[in-house]
Amino acid sequence: MDRKQKQAEKARPYGLLKPAALGKIPGRFQLHQEALPHLPVPPLQQTLDRYLLALQPIISEEELNHTQELVAEFRKPGGVGERLQKGLERRAKKTDNWLSDWWLKTAYLEYRLPVVVHSSPGVVLPKQDFQDRQGQLRFAAKLIEGILDFKTMIDNETLPVEYMGGKPLCMNQYYQILSSCRIPGPKRDSIVNYAKGKKQSRHITVVHNFQFFELDVYNSDGSPLTTDQLFIQLEKIWNTSLQTNKEPVGILTTNHRNSWAKAYNNLLKDKTNKESVRTIEKSICTICLDAPMPRVSDDIYKSPVAAQMLHGGGSRWNSGNRWFDKTLQFIIAEDGSCGLVYEHAPAEGPPIVALLDHIVEYTKKPELVRSPMIPLPMPKKLRFNITPEIKSDIEKAKQNLNIMVEDLDVIVLVFHQFGKNYPKSEKISPDAFIQLALQLAYYRMYGHSCATYESASLRMFRLGRTDTIRSTSIESHKFVQSMDSPDKSDQEKADLLRRATQAHKEYTNMAIQGNAIDRHLLGLKLQAIEDLVSIPELFMDTAYAVAMHFNLSTSQVPAKTDCVMCFGPVVPDGYGICYNPMGEHINFAISAFNSCADTNAARMAHYLEKALLDMRSLLQSAPKSKL
């Protein structure tokens, strides 16, 4: 029997089940996944044409001429390009997704910089109204209950399938975010997942004052603990971890991946340490009970909280109160600030935010269940034996982390003048409008356009992750050049603005249908490496390096909750910009490195705000054109 037939045999018994909202629906996830289309390999000539178009606004004419020669060589009939393309097409036939394994390895597991700042995004939640330990623990208990409620939907396979433009999306990432952890390796990391099977996780990790605890979250009959029960258990944890002089073992996870891999092997030589680390790795998720940060005024409150979510503030604050390899860590501080940080390898932002939206809604519900009064066992404290060698590893990690913390400049801008409803009223895609404002802000600051990355979801395809929307286009470049030019009328500028937003929308649609260029080019390059042939000159060209040097790395992560995701820049002289467009306002998080003299997050925020307002006034002053 071939693979397809086998799958069909497996799928048949469940084919009659009606998807119900409640109860277990075993096999539903599998069935849904198998019905999804495979990621296509785009036509070679199409990608090469689009690559040249993408280069036009960001490189000189001279460089472009040189690249055109390389492209002409690469695309010759029977040439290198065609050979690699055939290899990719063969790979696509043999696998569920020709890209996903390669992408996981190259983008995440083989990436050697620390996950902190360089890879793991944070999310800032609205400030909660508690100011003390009691409120902190009560909120944490409710939050855990919300996580377990979501976990039940995942376990029972009753999670509602998401759709985009009427097409069902791959739901696989939801099954990867709980009970999973990244493990450091000397050249490449790996991911472990304990969500399924007999050894399914029944506990979470709680960290307080750098001390880790194993907290069982299910009763012996399999029912999840209630908020009251969880609150009692969290109080026990709090009261048995009051010492503030403990070695912050968790800080080891903030180091460069190769250094951490060495320290990890070192740490695990001891049996007690190994058991403690395995318990953390197997847990459903981590809850970090943080000490309050220094007080700041309300108007800038969100910016230090964003930093807090991304890195914990450094070794004297809460960075030791984490295990950064854990996929999901929820952070709740005594002063009401809260959010999460997640390890990026298993999932993108949207599934994380969907989980978050669910939890936030859940925490608002009144408590109905009376808790059973059975006394619960004391949560187990995870012990670590710290040898002088481990102590020295911790000290080195602290120093490196503190340098990173000092270097990261992050600002949360809440743009209050309008939200996504305004561009919609002008029949413009809100995302295209915001991206064009970023282009305008950057152009006004630096006098030229730069390579811009916006993530596009490939979840219409089985195991799809992301591709790149290149927001810098010939059309966007024309618009930003014209915006402050006295030679153009408002009408002409408004027409260029509409053309640029239309071009962005078209590129977005192309990308989500698997027709963007970035992953295809990466695939051709990796195919060459796999075939052990020399890397084609096209990929050794300066233009390729410029195209891949994303001074603007951006992502729209919409949420029902009034939150904002944040991440660090992907190049030393760049910006990391994430935004959540709400109806009447837009939340932005903007990051840059202090070590780069040319970038400044506050300056970018200022120019971005001005760009958004100027684009609105332009549209209001020019009547709608006949485009």
UniProtKB/Swiss-Prot annotation:
Catalyzes the reversible transfer of acyl groups from carnitine to coenzyme A (CoA) and regulates the acyl-CoA/CoA ratio. Also plays a crucial role in the transport of fatty acids for beta-oxidation. Responsible for the synthesis of short- and branched-chain acylcarnitines. Active towards some branched-chain amino acid oxidation pathway (BCAAO) intermediates. Trans-2-enoyl-CoAs and 2-methylacyl-CoAs are poor substrates. Its EC number is 2.3.1.137, 2.3.1.7. It is an enzyme of class 2 (transferase). It comes from Columba livia (Rock dove). GO terms for cellular component: endoplasmic reticulum; mitochondrial inner membrane; peroxisome. (R)-carnitine binds at Y453, S455, T466. It is found in: Endoplasmic reticulum; Peroxisome; Mitochondrion inner membrane. InterPro entries: Carn_acyl_trans (IPR000542), CAT-like_dom_sf (IPR023213), Cho/carn_acyl_trans (IPR039551), Cho/carn_acyl_trans_2 (IPR042231). CoA binds at K420, K424, S425, E426, K427, I428, S429, P430, D431, S457, Q556. Belongs to the carnitine/choline acetyltransferase family. One of its GO terms (biological process) is carnitine metabolic process, CoA-linked. A motif (Microbody targeting signal) lies at residues 625-627. It catalyses: (R)-carnitine + acetyl-CoA = O-acetyl-(R)-carnitine + CoA; propanoyl-CoA + (R)-carnitine = O-propanoyl-(R)-carnitine + CoA; butanoyl-CoA + (R)-carnitine = O-butanoyl-(R)-carnitine + CoA; hexanoyl-CoA + (R)-carnitine = O-hexanoyl-(R)-carnitine + CoA. The active site is at H344. This is Carnitine O-acetyltransferase. It is a peripheral membrane protein. The keyword Nucleotidyltransferase does not apply. Monomer. Residues 1-30 form a propeptide. The modification N6-acetyllysine is found at K262, K269. GO terms for molecular function: acyl-CoA oxidase activity; carnitine O-acetyltransferase activity; carnitine O-octanoyltransferase activity.
